[in-house]
Amino acid sequence: MAQEKMELDLELPPGSAAAPSDGGGLRRSNSAPLIHGLSDNSQVFQGSVLRTRRNSTTVMNRHSLFVPSSPIRIPSSRLHQIKQEEGMNLMNRETVHEREVQVAMQMSQSWEESLSLSNNDFEKSSSPKQVDFVPVSPAPSPTRGIGKQCFSPSLQSLVSSSGLPPSPSPSPTRRFSSRRSQSPINCIRPSVLGPIKRKGVTEMEDHPKRLFQGSTNMLSSEALHQPDLGGCLSAHTLDDNRSSAGSSCDSPAEAGASTGSPVSLSDSRSPFLPVDLTAKLPID
């Protein structure tokens, strides 16, 4: 019965309902395809006829898939791309300009700093208040070393280099200036002990010459007086021999001792050894 009803339902025209039989009617399903005849070569689904289901989302056709790539939207995307490129170009130009401005500012700041530093250096070099250094000679004197002692010929004692007495007469070549010296020659100061040493040396050299000259004068005067004294002694002894011959006290030695011989005179006047001049005198 069911198969017969199915066949009757298939033979009905499309859109028509089956006649009621046996107290009930059969209705075709809306989702089932229309089948006109059953055969082995017949296609169950026909591709030419497409029907959509009710109460369901609409299915887009193949033509609807190409809607995004419509010729209306292509120029809009191109315009957007052109605008974006122009914006990028503007951004690049702005960044390049900003970089150039920053480089120029940095260069100007560096120039200002260098000029300010050079001005500060010039002010430091020109102002005497900021120069507080002691000039040091390239070849320092051994008598002016730190912690050394110097022998002062004027004071006749050892004097430390830090406690040197100030010179009463200032040196004309030594200048007490606080300016920065431009040549190393100004840094070399003459030694304070130089003229004192030379003065002492000249005094020591001149003193023995004076002593020697004085001794030669004394010797020459004594040598000139000795022949006169010898002549007086010989005349005196001859007179004594004539007046009192054979006397024991008339010997030339005793007479020379009593009357004052030139030997005693030379002993009292000169520091040299006495010379016996009576041995050279002729004895009568």
Swiss-Prot record:
It is found in: Nucleus; Cytoplasm. GO terms for cellular component: cytoplasm; nucleus. Keywords: Cytoplasm, Nucleus, Protein phosphatase inhibitor. Signal peptide: none annotated. Residues 258-269 have a biased composition (Polar residues). Residues 152-164, 172-184 have a biased composition (Low complexity). One of its GO terms (biological process) is mitotic G2/M transition checkpoint. InterPro entries: PBIR1/2/3. Residues 1-32, 112-198, 235-284 are annotated as: Disordered. Its main location: nucleus. One of its GO terms (molecular function) is protein serine/threonine phosphatase inhibitor activity. The keyword Ligase does not apply. Belongs to the FAM122 family. PANTHER family: FAMILY WITH SEQUENCE SIMILARITY 122B ISOFORM X1, PABIR FAMILY MEMBER 1. Acts as an inhibitor of serine/threonine-protein phosphatase 2A (PP2A) activity. Potentiates ubiquitin-mediated proteasomal degradation of serine/threonine-protein phosphatase 2A catalytic subunit alpha (PPP2CA). Inhibits PP2A-mediated dephosphorylation of WEE1, promoting ubiquitin-mediated proteolysis of WEE1, thereby releasing G2/M checkpoint. This is P2R1A-PPP2R2A-interacting phosphatase regulator 1.
